[in-house]
Design a protein with these regions (language model features):
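Active-site-adjacent loop and "lid" segments of alpha/beta metabolic enzymes
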Residues: 1-32, 40-150
Length: 150
């Protein structure tokens, strides 16, 4: 699902890929605003239950084991959780300890740079960051317009 834009064209909407290894987690990610659900870690039984409860077009079943593969920019999918962890490791932070704020900030930057898909377990917060970034960039209309008359 790699989307390209023409030079000078508007960047397409960034999609949020939530993580759903079981039916409850998948339903929660969808309810919190995930456009797609990553079901690659689901067991066959859980996958069958997820397929019953969610539309097939929202399930991500890409066979690649690592969505960042060798070249994250050519993959078209950026994992905000993994990118934030890599940044923390480069700064000398504790391995495996990433704050939600770092994940949200990483998702906002990726969205600003035009990433077509961002994957995260922090679905609600990352959805808000993607929407905020799109609004600031002018790619999303405001949810409510208030006009004041003096």
């Amino acid at each position: 699902m790699l989307r390209q834009t023409q030079p000078g064209g508007r960047a397409p909407q960034t999609l949020l890929l939530g993580v759903g290894a079981d039916p409850r987690q998948a339903a929660l990610a969808r309810a919190e605003g995930a456009d797609l659900i990553d079901v690659r870690a689901a067991t066959p039984e859980a996958l069958a239950a997820i397929r019953v409860s969610l539309p097939a077009d929202v399930l991500w079943t890409d066979p690649r084991t690592d969505p960042l593969c060798a070249d994250p920019l050519s993959a078209g999918l950026l994992d905000a959780d993994q990118l934030a962890a890599a940044g923390a490791a480069r700064r000398g932070g504790a391995a495996g300890r990433v704050t939600p704020a770092a994940v949200i900030a990483t998702a906002a930057v990726c969205s600003w740079l035009g990433a077509p898909v961002i994957r995260s377990r922090h679905t609600r917060a990352v959805r808000r960051a993607i929407d905020m970034t799109a609004s600031i960039a002018g790619r999303r209309p405001p949810s409510r317009t208030v006009r004041g008359l003096a």
